[in-house]
Amino acid sequence: MAPARRRLRLTFPSDLIHEPIIYRLAREFDIVVTVRRAEVTSDHGSVALEADADEEQLERGIAWLAQQGINVEPIA
């Protein structure tokens, strides 16, 4: 598959703030993640990032994020 880049905004619920979600996304799905902006408080987290990988890996990674309870929105 061809390499692809996605710009995404991830919104984390409070129970996942202390989990290594971005690390796992990068490691388990072989996605290069560049954090562009992050805001984390005691009750939520929001991260804007760029994700680079094969299209199939990106789709699998995004699906996994959603399964974890993370809201994933594309950034134009």
What are these model-derived regions, one by one?
Residues 1-76:
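Long, contiguous binding/interaction regions
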